[in-house]
Amino acid sequence: MTQKVGVLAIQGGYQKHADMFKSLGVEVKLVKFNNDFDSIDRLVIPGGESTTLLNLLNKHQIFDKLYNFCSSKPVFGTCAGSIILSKGEGYLNLLDLEVQRNAYGRQVDSFVADISFNDKNITGVFIRAPKFIVVGNQVDILSKYQNSPVLLRQANILVSSFHPELTQDPTVHEYFLAM
């Protein structure tokens, strides 16, 4: 069976995720409307600005459809996408996780760091990245940076505080496809 990955495309860095999956030979659908969810098997919620993303989800009336999809299908949230999936007022509240927005600094404080994932070193690109501060016991920590979790999984949901789509390394995207 061929998988079709949806990439939420209403705000943020969705095109880089789409390009990464296409480079892996995966069919990609840019998700902008409620009916777009019906033709995908899994979804990426990209980075961007979480408050703007929430406003647009509500403006375009896709918040409920997004919630229903993410409750049962594989989903991958990067940076702002991880914030939207976590606990918080107005968020999807699907992860036993609390985040601190912009915890690694402002845009000017962006950095690149090597992190270990699945016995391999990968590059983490941190841009106004959130910090995962309260991680529930249902959440698996897959990778850390300076003792702080940066890549997590809870059941069907994968989240990263960094941007794996901004590298040439498909390791995290391949992991998501195998979930």
Swiss-Prot record:
L-glutamine binds at residues 48-50, 101, 127-128. The keyword S-adenosyl-L-methionine does not apply. This is Pyridoxal 5'-phosphate synthase subunit PdxT. The active site is at 79 (nucleophile), 163 (charge relay system), 165 (charge relay system). In the presence of PdxS, forms a dodecamer of heterodimers. Only shows activity in the heterodimer. PROSITE patterns: PDXT_SNO_1, PDXT_SNO_2. It comes from the Bacteria. GO terms for molecular function: glutaminase activity; pyridoxal 5'-phosphate synthase (glutamine hydrolysing) activity. Pathway: Cofactor biosynthesis; pyridoxal 5'-phosphate biosynthesis. InterPro entries: Class_I_gatase-like, PdxT/SNO, PdxT/SNO_CS. It catalyses: aldehydo-D-ribose 5-phosphate + D-glyceraldehyde 3-phosphate + L-glutamine = pyridoxal 5'-phosphate + L-glutamate + phosphate + 3 H2O + H(+); L-glutamine + H2O = L-glutamate + NH4(+). CDD domains: GATase1_PB. Belongs to the glutaminase PdxT/SNO family. Pfam families: SNO (PF01174). Keywords: Glutamine amidotransferase, Hydrolase, Lyase, Pyridoxal phosphate. One of its GO terms (cellular component) is cytosol. Its EC number is 4.3.3.6, 3.5.1.2. GO terms for biological process: glutamine catabolic process; pyridoxal phosphate biosynthetic process; pyridoxine metabolic process. The keyword Lyase applies. Catalyzes the hydrolysis of glutamine to glutamate and ammonia as part of the biosynthesis of pyridoxal 5'-phosphate. The resulting ammonia molecule is channeled to the active site of PdxS.
